[in-house]
């Protein structure tokens, strides 16, 4: 059972989502509807985008805790560019470029300067957050044009253009990681860095690419945030890094690298967003969200560690059981002298 759960984390997350849907459907019959599903998906888009980027980084056995700050910085970038008179496309592209540069800088710190990822990104978390506050003077950005809001306006099947782009990115990343040699390089890098290098994998390039794409996904999340609410607070992005990591771990992405899928991370993000909707349904204050996210992350990490230890212990027991069985069989196996009395008599005579 434990081995099944360990090997089917995506299915476990999906089962948890369906179970929660069923329970909430019993409490409120209007909850179980297509409208509710699309509403949760719309709310989950920011976390889904962050989970996609975090997956790439975590697969390489690294972690990035600066994505919340990058999200806020890029949201401020697109807002300031729009208020300065730039077009929507140019402003969004500029924000994506800022996110990519921020992620690339993280990758340089980790890959070339050999700074541990958690230490490097803790530093850039403060750096990017401080830069965001310097640009805004600690004030909110308001008065954004209506064009930005249109990105989150439903157009087809109650899904916005950003929603369709998010689904396209999910499919593209799932295909990339599961069906290409480049995608498998992420798993190889995280599973065994030295072994991957000996096989010809450009591990430094893979890790820098992972951090850069993480920055791009954070920038896109910042654009989604600005388009959904129509203004940019001075604390945009706070706490999102914890939720992104929690979503990935919940969906089966290992902190030790080399294990997990994009689909699992997406299901984890969807489940966390669904939990937030439960808090709204129960009319709990908004500040419970971070507490619940931290509690879920801690619980999943403890469960994941205990589950991994139990599976490894079970595998060791099976190995030792086979070894013991083979030893017993070899001890009971008759020798040549036992089957041949004449050979036994000759041996005794020789003695």
Curated annotation (Swiss-Prot):
Keywords, alphabetical: Cell inner membrane, Cell membrane, Membrane, Transmembrane, Transmembrane helix, Transport
Membrane topology: Multi-pass membrane protein
Main location: membrane
TM regions (residue ranges): 14-34, 39-59, 70-90, 93-113, 115-135, 155-175, 213-233, 252-272, 284-304
GO MF annotation, one: transmembrane transporter activity
InterPro entries: ABC_transp_permease
Superkingdom of the organism of origin: Bacteria
GO cellular component, one term: plasma membrane
Assembly description: The complex is composed of two ATP-binding proteins (LsrA), two transmembrane proteins (LsrC and LsrD) and a solute-binding protein (LsrB).
Family as reported in the entry's similarity comment: Belongs to the binding-protein-dependent transport system permease family. AraH/RbsC subfamily.
Protein name: Autoinducer 2 import system permease protein LsrC
């Amino acid at each position: 059972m434990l081995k099944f759960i360990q090997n089917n984390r995506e299915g476990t997350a999906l089962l948890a989502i369906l179970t929660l849907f069923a329970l909430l459907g019993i409490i409120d019959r209007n909850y179980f509807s297509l409208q509710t599903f699309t509403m949760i998906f719309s709310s989950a888009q920011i976390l889904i985008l962050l989970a996609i980027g975090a997956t790439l980084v975590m697969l390489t056995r690294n972690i990035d805790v600066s994505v919340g700050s990058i999200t806020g910085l890029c949201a401020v970038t697109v807002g300031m560019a729009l208020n300065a008179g730039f077009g929507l496309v140019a402003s969004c592209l500029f924000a994506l470029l800022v996110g990519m540069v921020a992620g690339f800088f993280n990758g340089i710190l980790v890959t070339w300067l050999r700074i541990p990822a958690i230490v490097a990104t803790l530093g850039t978390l403060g750096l990017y957050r401080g830069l965001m506050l310097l640009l805004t003077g600690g004030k909110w950005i308001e008065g954004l044009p209506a064009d930005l809001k249109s990105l989150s306006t439903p157009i087809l099947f109650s899904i916005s253009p950003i929603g369709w782009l998010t689904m396209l990115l999910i499919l593209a990343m799932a295909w990339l990681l599961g069906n290409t040699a480049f995608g498998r390089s992420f798993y190889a890098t995280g599973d065994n860095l030295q072994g991957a290098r000996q096989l010809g994998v450009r591990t430094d390039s893979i890790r820098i690419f992972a951090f850069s794409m993480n920055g791009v996904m954070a920038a896109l999340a910042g654009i989604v945030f600005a388009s959904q609410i129509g203004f940019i607070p001075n604390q945009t992005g706070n706490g999102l890094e914890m939720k992104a990591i929690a979503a990935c771990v919940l969906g089966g992405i290992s902190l030790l690298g080399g294990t997990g899928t994009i689909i699992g991370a997406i299901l984890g993000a969807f489940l966390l967003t669904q939990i937030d909707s439960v808090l709204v349904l129960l009319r709990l204050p908004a500040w419970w969200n971070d507490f619940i996210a931290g509690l879920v992350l801690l619980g999943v990490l403890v469960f994941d560690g205990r589950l991994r230890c139990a599976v490894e212990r079970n595998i060791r027991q099976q190995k030792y059981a086979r070894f013991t069985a083979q030893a017993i069989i070899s001890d009971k196996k008759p020798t040549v002298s036992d089957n041949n009395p004449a050979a036994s008599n000759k041996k005794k005579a020789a003695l």
